[in-house]
From Swiss-Prot:
It is found in: Cytoplasm. Keywords: Cytoplasm, GTP-binding, Hydrolase, Magnesium, Metal-binding, Nucleotide-binding, Potassium, tRNA processing. Its EC number is 3.6.-.-. (6S)-5-formyl-5,6,7,8-tetrahydrofolate binds at R23, E80, K120, K454. This is tRNA modification GTPase MnmE. GO terms for biological process: tRNA methylation; tRNA wobble uridine modification. It comes from Pseudoalteromonas translucida (strain TAC 125). Binds 1 potassium ion per subunit. Its cofactor is K(+).
Length: 454
């Protein structure tokens, strides 16, 4: 793919630093080098040179490296200027470069987009760059790196190859209608289809783990005032993140903590106690609490174990349960076991899991951690995983649907054309993951979320 514009941007993070890098990509990279550093550096060699304005005034000095396309990150000619990391110096240099006719400032993610368009990496690898930059844990970074190195892509390519081979076999049989009945009962087709379905299920399970690693889980702690919600937040966070007093209604706004459980990102949200209140500020806090509940992956329904022996939230607070979004997972937390005499532990033999604990003494907190991991299906012991996004899971689910539909058609001995079409659709959805078949709108959405200079 030929890009008419040459683009430039700061590749290092904004702000002050020891080193700042300007990246230029496009057919005018050589021209930029001649105008700014006075020569075209030897390919892939670091050259220590002055950086000058178009008028010849020295702005900085540093290292210039030239990469000739297609042997560069973007597949185009690329120039990198590595100078001092002061924002003023970098801004002056970038302004001079953008004055050159045919050169403009890059849009967010445009370098990675060009790398994708020029077949230097596929879409999962491009997305992995952003995921690696945004990783919030060591395990998330490792998973993103695996995707960047093509681990996810290899799984998808293997699946696509097997689907293509089966399509060829099916469509060849369709061309010989006299043999089609024998083909439909051929054990090879059924066996190959079962093998593809099994492999797709394995990849989907791994992708779900990767999605959890990237997205994390939103957990809202909700309940009446003074039930110990903030104490639970502090115990899970391992620090005094929220003010705790004996006064009901101490928490009036939403408090957020971002923690990790064995590498799984967890967004814990403490909310104002839910009750009817004449206080305007508290009312606003309660409205925000419900906003968070409506966006949650799970709610920890906190209750004071000294107030009731019930564990069924529908009996304890039917109005609260009736207002929850349909399908939202709920765990009942019976707090203050140190005062109520409850045995610290977990009971999963009821409609809603019940955990008895003492948030104040941090007794039973590990039960909550393990429970949240189990709720989302996270396996912290998984090694060699890759990062995945919601769109990847959607594509895998669509592919699985069409494979299952094709299998049903085969078992009912319907005409092979229908099976062939289901296999074609399966291949299409799998190709969307790596970008072999992707709409321009989706590409724009993906790359616009990247950093400028990436």
């Amino acid at each position: 793919m030929i890009n008419q514009d040459t683009i430039a941007a700061q590749a290092t993070a904004p702000g002050r630093g020891g080193v700042g890098i300007i990246r230029v990509s496009g057919s005018l990279a050589k021209s930029v080098a001649e105008k700014v550093v006075g020569k075209i550096p030897k390919v892939r060699y670091a050259d220590y040179v002055p950086f000058k304005s178009l008028a010849g005034e020295q702005l900085d000095q540093g290292i210039a490296i030239y990469f000739a396309g297609p042997n560069s990150f973007t597949g185009e000619d690329v120039l990198e200027l590595q100078g001092h990391g002061g924002p003023v110096v970098l801004d002056m240099l970038l302004k001079e470069i953008s004055k050159i006719e045919g050169v403009r400032l890059a849009k967010p993610g445009e370098f990675s987009e060009r790398a994708f368009m020029n077949d230097k990496l596929d879409l999962t690898q491009a997305e992995a760059i952003a995921d690696l930059i945004n990783a919030t844990s060591e395990q998330a970074a490792k998973s993103a790196l695996q995707s960047l190195q093509g681990e996810f892509s290899k799984h998808i390519e293997t699946l696509v190859e097997k689907v293509i081979h089966l399509r060829m076999y099916v469509e060849a049989a369709i061309d010989f209608p006299d043999e089609e009945i024998d083909f439909l009962s051929d054990g090879k087709v059924s066996g190959d289809l079962d093998a593809i379905i099994a492999q797709l299920n394995t990849v989907t399970d791994q992708a779900k783990q990767g999605s959890i690693m990237r997205e994390g889980m939103r957990v809202v702690i909700a309940g009446r005032p003074n039930a110990g919600k903030s104490s639970l937040l502090n115990a899970l966070a391992g620090r005094e993140a929220a003010i705790v007093t004996e006064i009901a209604g101490t928490t009036r706004d939403v408090l957020r903590e971002h923690i990790h459980i064995d590498g799984m990102p967890l967004h814990i949200i403490d909310t104002a106690g839910l009750r009817e209140s004449p206080d305007l500020v508290e009312q606003i806090g309660i409205e925000r609490a419900w906003d968070e509940i409506n966006q949650a992956d799970r709610v920890l329904f906190m209750l004071d174990g000294t107030d009731t022996i019930d564990t069924d939230p529908h009996k304890i607070w039917p109005e609260f349960m009736a207002k929850l979004p349909v399908g939202l997972g709920v765990t009942v937390i019976r707090n203050k076991a140190d005062l109520s005499g409850d045995v610290v532990g977990m009971d999963q033999n009821q409609q809603y899991p019940v955990i008895s604990l003492s948030a104040k003494n941090a007794d039973g907190i590990e039960l909550v951690r393990e429970h949240l991991k189990a709720c989302i299906g996270f396996d912290g012991a998984t090694e060699g995983g890759f990062m995945a996004r919601r769109r990847h899971l959607d594509a895998l689910e669509h592919a699985a649907y069409h494979l299952d539909t094709g299998k049903a058609q085969l078992e009912m001995h319907i005409a092979g054309e229908i099976l062939a079409e289901e296999l074609r659709l399966t291949q299409q959805y799998l190709n969307e993951i790596t970008g072999e078949f992707t709409s321009d709108d989706l590409l724009g959405k993906i790359f616009s979320s990247f950093c400028i200079g990436k």
